[in-house]
């Protein structure tokens, strides 16, 4: 349905409209969707100015563009180039459809990723401050390699990296030693694996086991030297 636009009537109309009525709202939407017909298309005028007389004679309708000539040749309806009409669907039905289409978000299977990182994977983060010693990727790798063998290091941004240890004990040492950036430390390690990040009990047990082994090794060394 084409809407005839009268510019004088458009700008001189003073009667208030009741947009609660569907007919008034639809007419206003159709009027706004056809306002582009009042705007001059300077690019098309410039394009037509470069046409030769021979090209104009070849075209049945020289004022049409290439797409418009295709539409005219196939005799497609005029509504194909217009803006879509407003939907007359009731709000309660649209709400039901939106709820049905959004139910897939509640499925927990979609939230699980197919890739699970190794258990000994941690995320190392560091910050740079003027009054503190600067940290970079090289110094972070040196500090973490002292805790155990590292399989891979993947930079993730300018001040973070994903580090994979060969064994989970070394990862526990790193997370236990660098839990937060407090106390003047500009370096922090956290778990990347969801199981290790959620299960704090396992992380504490592994960390306490590491401290116990370290304490036993330090206690046993003087005895071996004494013997």
Curated annotation (Swiss-Prot):
Top-level taxon of the source organism: Eukaryota
Protein name: Testis expressed protein 56
The organism of origin for this protein: Mus musculus
InterPro entries in the cross-refs: Tex56 (IPR027827)
Expression sites (tissue/organ): Expressed predominantly in the testis.
Gene that this polypeptide is encoded by: Tex56
Effect of deleting the gene: Deficient mice are viable and have normal fertility.
Pfam families the record matches: DUF4523
């Amino acid at each position: 349905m084409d809407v005839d636009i009268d510019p004088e009537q458009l700008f001189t109309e003073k009667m208030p409209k009741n947009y609660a009525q569907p007919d008034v709202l639809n007419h206003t939407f159709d009027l706004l969707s056809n306002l582009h017909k009042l705007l001059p298309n300077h690019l098309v005028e410039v394009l037509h100015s470069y046409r030769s007389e021979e090209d104009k004679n070849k075209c049945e309708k020289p004022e049409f563009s290439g797409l418009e000539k295709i539409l005219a040749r196939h005799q497609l309806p005029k509504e194909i180039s217009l803006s879509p009409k407003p939907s007359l669907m009731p709000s309660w039905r649209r709400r039901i459809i939106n709820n049905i289409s959004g139910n897939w978000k509640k499925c927990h299977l979609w939230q699980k990723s197919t890739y699970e990182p190794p258990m000994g994977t941690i995320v190392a983060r560091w910050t740079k401050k003027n009054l503190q010693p600067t940290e970079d990727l090289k110094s972070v790798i040196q500090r973490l390699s002292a805790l155990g063998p590292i399989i891979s290091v993947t930079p993730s941004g300018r001040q973070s990296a994903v580090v994979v240890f060969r064994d989970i004990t070394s990862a526990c040492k790193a997370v236990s030693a660098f839990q937060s950036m407090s106390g003047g430390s500009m370096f922090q390690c956290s778990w990347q694996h969801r199981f290790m990040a959620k299960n704090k009990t396992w992380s504490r047990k592994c960390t306490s086991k590491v401290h116990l082994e370290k304490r036993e090794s330090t206690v046993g060394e003087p005895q071996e030297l004494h013997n």
